[in-house]
Structure formats: structure tokens, C-alpha cells
Amino acid sequence: MPKTPANVKPMDVLKSALSRNVLIDVKGNREYSGILEGYDVYMNIVLQNASEIINGENKGVYDRVLVRGDNVIFVSPSKGDGS
């Protein structure tokens, strides 16, 4: 039986996004876009080749970024990610 939104768990979504481009929206009008390298049960997230976007403006690219889980608002596949 295919999974419907009612029975999809957040950690399953993160697991399926490993090694793919994701967009993370965090508190303070910030976003990070990069390759999901890892995460834990607290939603701490590690991205590779991450772009930091503040108020819609790209502020820089970093080799590796750790986003603290209590700042995460949502995580979604990046636009144009064909994986």
C-alpha cells in the first residue's frame, strides 16, 4: 500500500532525502540550500555545499553547515532536484 501524507513520518522523509538537494527554512528569515549529509532525532541537520540565504539574498556558500534542529521550520526538496 503506498504511503499517504497521513502515515508518512518526518524521519522517513529525511531518510529518503539523504544525498539529495534540500531547502531548509529556519527562524530569522534564513534558508539553507544544499546536499543533505545527515540528521539526528533532534532535527539537527548537516548540509554539504550549502548556500545561506537571508531575506532572499544569497550570503555565501559553505563546504559544510550544521543547522540546529530547534531553529528548523521546514525541510523540503530543492527546486530542480531531479534525484
From Swiss-Prot:
Record has Transmembrane as a keyword: no
A single GO BP: mRNA splicing, via spliceosome
GO molecular function terms listed in the Swiss-Prot or TrEMBL record: RNA binding
Domain Sm: 9-81
UniProt KW Ribonucleoprotein keyword: yes
Leader peptide range in chain numbering: none
Pfam families: LSM
GO-annotated cellular components: ribonucleoprotein complex; Sm-like protein family complex
Domain of life the protein comes from: Archaea
UniProt entry keywords in alphabetical sequence: Ribonucleoprotein
SMART domains: Sm (SM00651)
Family: Belongs to the snRNP Sm proteins family.
This protein's name: Putative snRNP Sm-like protein
UniProt organism field: Thermoplasma acidophilum (strain ATCC 25905 / DSM 1728 / JCM 9062 / NBRC 15155 / AMRC-C165)
